[in-house]
């Protein structure tokens, strides 16, 4: 009789610890890096469009916090955001000149966990 009670106590304790962790720090259960970053460039207007896929139910708490743009390996733009405009897919536009031989690298960083980088190469 003692053995089944001990197992049930252990299982109950493990479930209780998991639920306490889940309730005390829920962001870890929702934290994920951006799933995708797509780049588009309009040479006429010299505008870089960065389309980011980052699913979040709490866009004011779990969002893409930084977007960093490097041109030929040198950081030229870093924008900091306090929320995400859409809970799944959204785009930002940046004025930046680029031409033949240039490379643009964009990194989107989650406010809680991880980042995703995309590169646009303009060839030689």
What are these regions (language model features)?
Residues 66-70:
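Beta-strand signatures of extracellular beta-sandwich domains
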Residues 74-85, 121-123:
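Solvent-exposed serine/threonine-rich low-complexity stretches and specific carbohydrate-binding patches
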Residues 26-34:
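Proline/serine/threonine-rich low-complexity linkers at boundaries of modular beta-sandwich domains
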Residues 108-118:
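Short acidic/polar inter-strand loop motif in beta-rich domains
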Residues 56-62:
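A short beta-turn/strand-edge loop motif at beta-sheet boundaries
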Residues 95-102, 110:
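Surface-exposed, short loops/turns at beta-strand junctions within beta-sandwich domains
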Residues 50-52, 89-97:
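Exposed aromatic-hydrophobic patches
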Residues 44-48:
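Structural beta-strand segments of beta-rich domains
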